[in-house]
């Protein structure tokens, strides 16, 4: 037992040291480097004009976003007018740890449990293609675009053709779910499934501001940026504030949490 306890303590110390060093590196190396790159970035006011002299440089690009290829989910066979989406799945399960009040339960629910949707399981995001002005967006740039909305603009005809139905549920934060159509004609039962999609919130014709590295006519990802694609035309200061480095407060919290892990590990080793 003592050996397992010490082994657990050693593991906590190793994990704590790793995260502590990573947090310090972010605060004292990565953040200053990223801020310096943003301050030195070339501000491109019109994305229709690409200057070859900016190749290899960090650029702040303002222009009109265009979705050139929608994101496609192979699992359900659906297209989305978004450059990046992620599907999440919920399964109906019987649970005895329900928040439902006992007096509201049926005898079967008291005996076997209450049917509830379990926690969501998210798959890897899938992406389409897009451009800003004459800049094509590279795959690594697209992979860094934030998913900030739950998709609700479903094409009902396309859903029906694929065998799914839009079933909103306001009792959940995500609200906008789809289910296999054959589930919607009966009461729910265990192992029923439903899905929702998280998506990047950008539409063709929107004015956007992007941070990236110019590579010919392609905009590539810039390491260390928290938000590489933003709505509206932003000036340099607004870009640095909104899309710059992660907050120092969060990184300090991470460093302190790492120290607590290390301390906990040492206590397990010596006690």
Question: What residues fall within each predicted segment?
Answer:
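Hydrophobic secretory-pathway targeting helix
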Residues: 1-36, 257, 266-267
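A short linear-motif detector with a strong N-terminal bias
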Residues: 6, 38-40, 66-70
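Functionally constrained cores in energy, signaling, and assembly domains
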Residues: 22-25, 30, 45, 65, ...
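Alpha-helical transmembrane signal-anchor/signal-peptide segments
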Residues: 27-53
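Charged, low-complexity helical/coil segments in non-catalytic cytosolic or luminal regions
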Residues: 27-32, 57, 81-271
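Short, charged/polar low-complexity linear motifs in solvent-exposed/disordered segments
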Residues: 40, 78-79
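Short extracytoplasmic
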Residues: 44-77
């Amino acid at each position: 037992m003592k050996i397992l306890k010490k082994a657990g303590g050693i593991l906590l110390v190793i994990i704590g040291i790793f995260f502590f060093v990573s947090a310090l590196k972010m605060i004292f190396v990565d953040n200053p480097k990223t801020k310096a790159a943003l301050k030195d970035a070339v501000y491109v006011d019109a994305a229709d004009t690409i200057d070859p002299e900016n190749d290899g440089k960090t650029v702040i690009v303002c222009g009109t976003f265009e979705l050139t290829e929608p994101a496609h989910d192979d699992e359900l066979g659906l297209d989305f007018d978004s450059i990046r989406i992620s599907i999440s799945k919920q399964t109906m399960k019987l649970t005895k740890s329900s928040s439902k009040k006992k007096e509201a339960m049926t005898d079967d629910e008291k005996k076997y449990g209450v049917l509830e949707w379990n926690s969501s399981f998210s798959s890897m995001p899938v992406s389409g293609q897009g451009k800003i002005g004459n800049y094509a967006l590279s795959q690594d740039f697209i992979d860094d675009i934030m998913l900030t909305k739950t998709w609700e603009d479903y094409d009902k005809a396309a859903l029906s053709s694929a065998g799914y139905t839009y079933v909103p549920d306001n009792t959940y934060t995500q609200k906008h779910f789809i289910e296999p159509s054959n589930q919607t004609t009966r009461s729910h039962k265990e192992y029923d499934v439903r899905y929702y999609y998280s998506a990047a919130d950008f539409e063709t014709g929107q004015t956007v501001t992007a941070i990236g590295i110019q590579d010919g006519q392609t905009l590539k990802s810039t390491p260390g940026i928290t938000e590489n694609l933003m709505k509206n035309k932003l000036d340099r200061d607004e870009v640095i504030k909104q899309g710059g480095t992660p907050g120092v407060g969060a990184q300090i919290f991470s460093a302190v949490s790492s120290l607590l892990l290390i301390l906990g590990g040492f206590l397990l080793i010596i006690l």
